[in-house]
Amino acid sequence: MGAQPEQTQKPSSRVQTLFKRVKAFFTKTGPPPPPPAPSRNLGCTHVYGYVFGHLGEREPEHSPSQQVLDTGEQLMVPVDVLEVDNEGALWKFLLSGAMAGAVSRTGTAPLDRAKVYMQVYSSKKNFMNLLGGLRSLIQEGGIRSLWRGNGINVLKIAPEYAIKFSVFEQCKNYFCGVHESPPFQERLLAGSLAVATSQTLINPMEVLKTRLTLRRTGQYKGLLDCARQILEQEGTRALYRGYLPNMLGIIPYACTDLAVYEMLNCLWLKSGRDMKDPSGLVSLSSVTLSTTCGQMASYPLTLVRTRMQAQGQLGPFSNLAYHDPLPLLSELSHDPPKHTQTDSQTLHI
């Protein structure tokens, strides 16, 4: 009698065992992966738990996100998706990043044009503030003129992002192989090389963007006409004006951005809070502040770059004749329009 319950329960136990095996088969996962190295590519996301030696701690998984408004002035590679070996995710991020960048740059186009206008035409004798600059632009070309140059600014998003991501991925694989995560220093170097390469290739588009942003009503018929006039009147070298200060600007931007971000991490650690899971507001504030400081550090070179890109032999830029950034930087340091520089720097940030 004692063996009969075992015979009646044996089939049900087998069924339970079978279901457990099927469930285990479909939910089977490999060993837990090592903690991912954060993609602190100086302009976008997380470095918590990495810079300060917390490599053994598991970080919460997070989807790729861009936490800084794209106005076209961010230098470093701003993505998390590069850490994922998934080309589909990369292209999805490229598409979503391009669409978001187009919206954000279009929304900030009036301020961007006012900034460039103030950077080029302001001087100690010709003081210009934000309202005065916007008023001058509207009087010259109307409300629609505030969006001049926005087309090329949006158009260069796709090649800029694609070159940055491709070069970054190749450099990362070269440093540490395809399936290994590079140290933070090598990741920073890979990001800098990617930015330098992309800026080298799209510098002609930057010059066209500056010229179209500053153009008078009826000066150019469009993008191709602007490029044709530059090539005919100034030569091919004009398309690479401002290249040197643009490259030099990567150094103070990257170093300042990184230093501020690490300082904020130290403050977060000393506060006794959990570093592994900072809130979205904390992460956004840290990235925004570090990026702002980086832009402030590189702003003098950005100003020199813009003035060199705007100069020309004919047209409204004929009063500018700088072929070397050093004389222009020296002139700005000895006789700066302080108030106007502050206003245009605020718009730049």
Curated annotation (Swiss-Prot):
Q: Give compartment(s).
A: Mitochondrion inner membrane
Q: Which UniProt keywords apply?
A: Membrane, Mitochondrion, Mitochondrion inner membrane, Repeat, Transmembrane, Transmembrane helix, Transport
InterPro entries for the chain? Mit_carrier (IPR002067), Mitochondrial_sb/sol_carrier (IPR018108), Mt_carrier_dom_sf (IPR023395)
**GO CC terms in record:** mitochondrial inner membrane; mitochondrion
**Topology relative to the membrane:** Multi-pass membrane protein
Keyword match DNA-binding: no
Q: One GO molecular-function annotation for this sequence?
A: ATP transmembrane transporter activity
BP GO terms, sorted: ADP transport; ATP transport; mitochondrial ADP transmembrane transport; mitochondrial ATP transmembrane transport
Predominant location = mitochondrion
Q: In terms of domain of life, where is this protein from?
A: Eukaryota
Q: Which residues are listed as membrane-spanning?
A: 88-104, 149-168, 188-205, 243-261
Instruction: Indicate the family of this protein.
Output: Belongs to the mitochondrial carrier (TC 2.A.29) family.
Q: Which PANTHER family match?
A: SOLUTE CARRIER FAMILY 25 (PTHR24089)
Protein name as it appears in the record: Mitochondrial carrier protein SCaMC-3L
- The organism of origin for this protein: Bos taurus (Bovine)
